[in-house]
Every structure is written in structure tokens, then in C-alpha cells.
Amino acid sequence: MASNSSSCPTPGGGHLNGYPVPPYAFFFPPMLGGLSPPGALTTLQHQLPVSGYSTPSPATIETQSSSSEEIVPSPPSPPPLPRIYKPCFVCQDKSSGYHYGVSACEGCKGFFRRSIQKNMVYTCHRDKNCIINKVTRNRCQYCRLQKCFEVGMSKESVRNDRNKKKKEVPKPECSESYTLTPEVGELIEKVRKAHQETFPALCQLGKYTTNNSSEQRVSLDIDLWDKFSELSTKCIIKTVEFAKQLPGFTTLTIADQITLLKAACLDILILRICTRYTPEQDTMTFSDGLTLNRTQMHNAGFGPLTDLVFAFANQLLPLEMDDAETGLLSAICLICGDRQDLEQPDRVDMLQEPLLEALKVYVRKRRPSRPHMFPKMLMKITDLRSISAKGAERVITLKMEIPGSMPPLIQEMLENSEGLDTLSGQPGGGGRDGGGLAPPPGSCSPSLSPSSNRSSPATHSP
């Protein structure tokens, strides 16, 4: 009995109950659990030669059945069933799989990853209970991120994923030489040139001052406001020209170009004016040479924003940024994939990556003994965004204080800014009257759109 059991055919031997099994039996688990058809063994026995025994030995069956493998073909492998995922837990769009612990679409996956990796802090300008779905998901980043957490997306999964990638592709940071490659050098020069052509250095300006309200702070000096708003309009035009010269910017969709310009224009204006700060006189100089002290800046329209801007200017002084660094930092502020309502945020991120690399290499090559300067510069973007958010709020109050309407280009720059929607249709203070503001006849101010056939600024919403 023992010898018989040891020679019984097994699945590993390629047979089961006298029937041939495919060479790769693990591909066909249903076959391994099945029973042989009735009479199969009897039929096989009749086909075997009789050599004095009424019942052939198991070894004989194994030998014969092996020769029949060539006769009985293996059944074809059934096609795998397509995986069906639940809709995205965040916005109910079509899911692409399980990401960071939940079923999610590509858009919400990328948004959550960028938010965690960049430690983004968002603000809700409503009641922190915005409806998040496929249509509204880009309208409030704060509520979208909260929804990600509510449905179970994990911060740790993002960090672990990032650490895993770092382990798979180790980067020897300590061995980096920070050599300027021709490609990086060319990119830096293009950005430097774009910055210099649209923003002359302080040493190139013929400074002049005014005695208007230079001693005491008031709510608003109308003469200073008129001058300040005129200069601000010119600065916005120069910022648009700067953006057009940045490599790859005009390859983005028109809607994304407008979105990026509107989102970052105030950041760039503040960064630029702060590089023209003179600490000895506590003054700032505009592009036409007009130099205002802190009190005059307050009275010109900065109001409660004044001290924040001057404090930021003081923080820039130790960085000793040159034109290339200021231009690159401005470009990084502008070309940023986490801005609201972008159509192609991943493409914007791809354009930003070489700018970040160029700034890192340039800063560390220029200051080899101060490796901390690059992250310090990047952190200034967070400060800029904080000041800009307060700047947008200041524009709201300004619209109520100025006697006329807001200049059309300033109006367009903040047309869709967060927090300004509440003013739509409100009377007084130059607020929009449903139809919006059209530029004055013969105005040469371009709109924020890089295309030349745009309609009037107030009638276009990207």
C-alpha cells in the first residue's frame, strides 16, 4: 500500500486523476480543484496493454498519460476581468485607482500630493463647508484638502511614497558640484534678461521725491493714490511682458496663462518694489524714480499693508539677491502648479522644475559657503503669498475709499481673486456693476491675456 501511494500522480507531476494538466498548473486554479469525468480512468485502462495483470500499475498509467499530453491541448487562459473602482471619494469623478488609502481620480491624487509635499496652507473665503464635486473641486482648495482628509487620504502615505522614491533613486547631495551646465546657464540668462528689460535696477533710476503727506499718516492721500495707481498699472504691464519672455510660458493654454498672471501679479509687484528699498532713508523707489517714505507709502494706498511690506523688504536685505535671483524667484512665483483653477497643473509643475533647479545651482555656486540660502529664498514665496492675500483684502477697502473707479488693469488683475467675488455688483466705491469696467477709449494698457484679440478686460473671465 505504501508503494502505491508514493507513485500516485500529483498536480506537481503534471497530471490529476489520470488527466493531463498544463505545464503551468498555477495559471488555472479552477482545473486543480475539479473532478475527472466518470469512466475516464476505465477508458484509459482499456487503451493500455495487458501484461498479466487485470489492473495496470499506477506507474504504467503515468507513462501512458504522459504520452497523451501532446494530444490533449490546454484550455486557453480566460482574459482578466477589468478592475472596476468606486468613483473618486473626494469629487465623485472617475477613479484611476486607490491612492493614499482611498479610491481617487488623478486630479485629486495630484492635488493632495502637492499640498502635502509643499506644506500648502489654504484659506476658505466662505464658511469652510464648500461643496466639492467634479465641477466645483477647483474653486476652494481649503475645502478640497479637508475633504481629502475626511474621506481618509493619508499624509503618511505621501511621505512614505516620497521616501520610497528617494531610496530607489538615491541622490548623492554631498557630491553635487553645482556646475552650471550650458542648458541651465542659458535658462538663467533668459530669465535675467527678461527681468532687467522689464524692471530697471535702483542704480539706473533718477530719484525724485514729493512733499505730499510725508509727515503724518492719513487714510488716503488722493494725489498720491492717483500717482501710485498710474505707476501700478505700468508695473502690471511690465510684469505681463516679463511672463511672456519666460521659457515655456506662452506654450501653456491661454486660460492657464491668465490664471497664473492674476494669481502671482501681486506677489511679483511686492517682490520687485521691495528690492528697491533703501534702509538708510526707509524709502522705496518706483520705476519712474518716484521715491516715497513709509508714511507716504501708507497714504498712497498701502494702508495697513505698509509695515508688512517694509518688514519683508528688510528681510530681503541679508539675502543680497542679484537680478538673476530676483528674476528666477519671480518666475517660480508665477509658474506654480498649485494655483487655483488651472487646466494643466502638472504641465505647469514641469515648467517650474528647471527654474527651481536653476535657482538652486546659481545660488549655491554664488555662495558656496552658505548652502542654506537657497531654501531661505524659497521660503520668501510663502511670505509673499501671505502679504498678497492681505493686499487683495486691501484692494477691497480701497474700492470703497477712492472717489472714482479702480483703474481697469488693476481691476482685471484682481477680477477673479479670492475674496473679491463678494464685491460683484455692489454699488459705491467704484465696485463692478454687473457689466464690469471697460478700459477707457484709446487706452493702450494691454489686458492680462497674452493674446492680442482679447475683448475688454471686464467682459472676459477665464
Curated annotation (Swiss-Prot):
PTM sites of type Phosphoserine: S77, S96, S219, S369
Alphabetized UniProt keyword annotations: Chromosomal rearrangement, Cytoplasm, DNA-binding, Isopeptide bond, Metal-binding, Nucleus, Phosphoprotein, Proto-oncogene, Receptor, Transcription, Transcription regulation, Ubl conjugation, Zinc, Zinc-finger
Function field: Receptor for retinoic acid. Retinoic acid receptors bind as heterodimers to their target response elements in response to their ligands, all-trans or 9-cis retinoic acid, and regulate gene expression in various biological processes. The RXR/RAR heterodimers bind to the retinoic acid response elements (RARE) composed of tandem 5'-AGGTCA-3' sites known as DR1-DR5. In the absence of ligand, the RXR-RAR heterodimers associate with a multiprotein complex containing transcription corepressors that induce histone deacetylation, chromatin condensation and transcriptional suppression.
Protein name, as recorded: Retinoic acid receptor alpha
Residue ranges constituting the NR LBD domain according to the UniProt record: 183-417
Tissue specificity note: Expressed in monocytes.
Regions crossing the membrane: none
Motif 9aaTAD boundaries: 408-416
Motif (UBR5-degron): 254-258
Region (Disordered): 52-77, 419-462
Gene name of the encoded protein: RARA
Binding-site residues for all-trans-retinoate, renumbered to this chain: C235, S287
Zinc finger feature spans (NR C4-type): 88-108, 124-148
A GO term for molecular function: DNA-binding transcription repressor activity
